[in-house]
């Protein structure tokens, strides 16, 4: 809390609070104390470990920004592993075609 207050006084645009806990109680306690200290800069949450919390509860507790930091990367790994296994098992990529984007889709994406 002290560090957040110092950052706020120094002109920080937001305060990102992270926690290794499995529940959001620690960050909710911080948010309540931060609000009492009359700091009005936005609070940012990164709910990686406390993933059961709903956005509405983060918002209700004073968080203005929610960052899902690495979920897309973590989701891509099982998909890549599945395609790699298919190619190794079948000795060709044809069997994995239904699981992947077409070349046309990728080209359109990067245009």
Positions of predicted regions on the chain:
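Alpha/beta enzyme core
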Residues: 1-68, 74-85
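Extended, intrinsically disordered, low-complexity segments
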Residues: 71-111
């Amino acid at each position: 809390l002290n560090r957040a207050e110092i950052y706020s006084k120094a002109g920080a645009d937001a305060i990102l609070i992270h926690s290794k806990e499995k529940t959001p109680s620690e960050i909710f306690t911080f948010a309540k104390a931060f609000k009492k200290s009359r700091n009005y800069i936005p609070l940012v949450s990164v709910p990686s470990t406390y993933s059961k919390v709903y956005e509405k509860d983060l918002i209700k507790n004073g968080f203005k920004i929610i960052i899902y930091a690495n979920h897309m990367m973590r989701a891509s790994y099982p998909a890549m592993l599945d395609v790699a296994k298919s190619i190794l098992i079948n000795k060709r990529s044809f069997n994995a075609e239904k699981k992947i984007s077409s070349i046309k889709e990728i080209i359109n994406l990067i245009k």
